[in-house]
């Protein structure tokens, strides 16, 4: 059977989604918020939940952000389809497939995780809690977990966390 760039992209997306969600579910049900596990001196699994966009920036409402993510994934999916159809290099198709899978994983988090998990503050979250989840549909937090401490630095004392947050 001949290798197809389209099926290669689908395989990358499916494998990454399965690994991503399995690892996120394991982390949510086995680690407390802000707990870390050292894999190597330069790679940690670090459990944090992202309530907004990149770095936790909360500029717009959660519902709008979730809808924006869904629309963006539609555009990325169409772009990926065009790349395969126009016979682009598979290396580039694979890179866009990784981005696409990561974006879909974030949508899964924001759509479902608020409903199927309880909160993670000061406890290990439980799956399908009796009292329901911590938020409604499209209001879940995105689970972030990879941490690469490649540069060790300290911010000056006059820079506080509140200065780094978008208002």
Language-model-derived ranges and their functions:
Residues 1-165:
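Alpha-helical transmembrane bundles and membrane-interface segments of multipass inner-membrane proteins
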């Amino acid at each position: 059977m001949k290798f197809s760039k389209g099926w290669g992209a689908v395989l990358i997306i499916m494998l990454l989604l399965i690994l991503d969600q399995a690892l996120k579910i394991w982390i949510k049900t086995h680690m407390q918020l802000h707990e870390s596990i050292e894999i190597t001196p330069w790679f940690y699994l670090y459990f944090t939940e992202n309530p907004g966009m990149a770095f936790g920036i909360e500029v717009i409402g959660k519902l709008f952000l979730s809808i924006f993510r869904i629309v963006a994934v539609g555009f990325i999916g169409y772009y990926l389809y065009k790349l395969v159809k126009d016979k682009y290099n598979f290396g580039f198709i694979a890179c866009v497939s990784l981005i696409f899978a990561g974006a879909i994983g974030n949508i899964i988090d924001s759509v479902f995780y608020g409903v199927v998990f309880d909160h993670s503050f000061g406890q290990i979250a439980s799956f399908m809690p009796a009292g329901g989840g911590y938020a409604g549909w499209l209001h879940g937090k995105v689970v972030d977990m990879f941490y690469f401490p490649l540069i060790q630095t300290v911010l000056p004392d006059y820079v506080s966390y509140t200065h780094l947050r978008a208002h």
